[in-house]
């Protein structure tokens, strides 16, 4: 059984989590979001299994962690996760720009644990309530990784 963590359950994070839940009911899904109402809705709909705090030990158990907050927040989470995730955990983001986050990945020497991602999907609506397991269905998911390192080997799993 895989464990997948989410930082942010807005339109994209919520849609990815809903799609994973739909196709992999046995996966364990953990999530943190600044909006407590979003987390309550995710739990009540059985989309996530556990609500996490921003800096939560349970993220150590994740096989993958999706950074689905705004880019500037995703960059900040890298610093925390550098020393607070399992040795084989892969981090990925869904931000539309990669320069800032890739510079931070390199500065923190996390290249073997990070795959930049960008789902080519969206909506004029925002937030968890607009998310759907169908939003990313048949959408391209662009990945950008460091080809000489371990993260590249796991892209196919995503």
Predicted regions and their residues:
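NAD(P)+-binding Rossmann beta1-loop-alpha1 motif at the extreme N-terminus of oxidoreductases
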Residues: 1-54
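Glycine-rich, N-terminal phosphate-binding loop of Rossmann-like dinucleotide-binding domains
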Residues: 69, 95, 145
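Receiver (REC) domain switch-region micro-motif
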Residues: 4, 65, 91
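Rossmann-like NAD(P)-binding element
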Residues: 57-82
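Conserved small/polar residues in nucleotide/adenosyl-binding loops
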Residues: 147-154
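Rossmann-like NAD(P)(H) cofactor-binding subdomain of soluble oxidoreductases
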Residues: 80-129
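Acidic/polar active-site rim loop that often engages polyanionic ligands
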Residues: 133-142
């Amino acid at each position: 059984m895989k464990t997948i963590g989410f930082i942010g359950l807005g339109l994209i994070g919520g849609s990815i989590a809903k799609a994973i839940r739909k196709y992999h009911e046995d996966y364990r899904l953990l999530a943190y979001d600044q909006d407590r109402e979003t987390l309550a809705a995710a739990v009540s709909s059985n989309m996530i299994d556990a609500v996490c705090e921003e800096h939560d030990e349970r993220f150590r158990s994740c096989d993958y962690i999706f950074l689905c907050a705004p880019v500037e927040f995703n960059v900040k989470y890298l610093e925390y996760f550098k020393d607070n995730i399992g040795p084989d955990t892969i981090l990925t983001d869904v931000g539309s720009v990669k320069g800032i986050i890739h510079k931070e990945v390199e500065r923190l020497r996390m290249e073997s644990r990070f795959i930049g991602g960008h789902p080519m999907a969206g909506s004029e609506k925002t937030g968890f309530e607009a998310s759907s397991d169908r939003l990313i269905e048949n959408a391209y998911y662009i990945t950008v990784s460091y080809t000489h390192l371990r993260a590249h080997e796991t892209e196919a799993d995503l």
